[in-house]
Amino acid sequence: PVAISGTHGKTTTTSMLSHIALAADLDPTISVGGILKAIEGNIRVGGPDLFITEACEYTNSFLHFFPKIGIILNVDADHLDFFKDLDDIRNSFHLFAKLLPENGTLVINGDIDKIEEITSDLSCRVITFGKEASLNYSAANITYNEQGNASFDVVKDGQNVAHLALAVGGEHNVYNALAAIAVADILGVPAETIQTGLASFHGTDRRFEYKGEVGGVTIIDDYAHHPTEIAATLKSAAHYPHKKLWCIFQPHTYTRTKALFSEFAEALAHADHVILADIYAARETDTLGISSTQLADAVKEHGCDATYLPSFAAIEEFVTTHCQPGDLLITMGAGDVVTIGEDLLKA
């Protein structure tokens, strides 16, 4: 089995690797945490030789896997209702890496802070990818087309081995792709087939998903609910054609909003205008004294226009009167904020 872990990018990377495996006729069995159009769902039952699955760290659930190849995309502070702190999270990923057998391989982002705490005393082979040219797999000469989709050279152990073009946007997806490329390389998939697979991947539901256009305003929906994801999505949007960038953000859980409050404010300020909906409680009942009004004020301190509105109806009315033709509007969050864009398109 190939188990794909990390705080962010699991669904996208699992989907990218699945597309490559399908293009290579490897008949993969697939389990992905989002709807993947290529398999018309989130599960594909294929042959017994290759199982590609997402592996989530929440409640240490990924420690119940038996992977032969493991990916760690990144390690960030999240799920702090379960983990004590970042050291606790790092230790969890270390335990995940230790699951890999001697003849197994860990593919890990070499840019992870204190990576040695994860990779120490492992019996498996370790392969790195990331921004630094000294890593096993890195990307050079990254360029973006008018849709914000990246093309780049794949550099393996210092040698330029391929030039690839993605059909999804953002720098973060270059590194998600590198992880998928590294595993595909281990599986013996040729570069041309890797390119075919990646070119056929246009994203999963709720990951920078184009919803439509109304009154000249383009509406995108994105699942980002952690500051790192928010910043990555808004930076991706900067490469997308637009006049002003609007972000309607619905914070997800009081615990996360409180723990990462200043990081949220800084990340959201990458937009031109931010509209905050009420916090989506999910499994929580205690508000911890935190509110979207406070977050709006914190975003303003970064010099960004921010507004809190108490209902989806009020938000829909506000953007209808304030957005201009040519603007880009992103609904963002892991709750039900997607319905705002869908309502606007129905209007």
Predicted features by range, described:
Residues 31-34, 123-146, 165-171, 195-199, ...:
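Beta-strand->loop->alpha-helix junctions that form or flank phosphate-binding loops
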Residues 105-110, 247-250, 270-281:
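Short internal beta-strands
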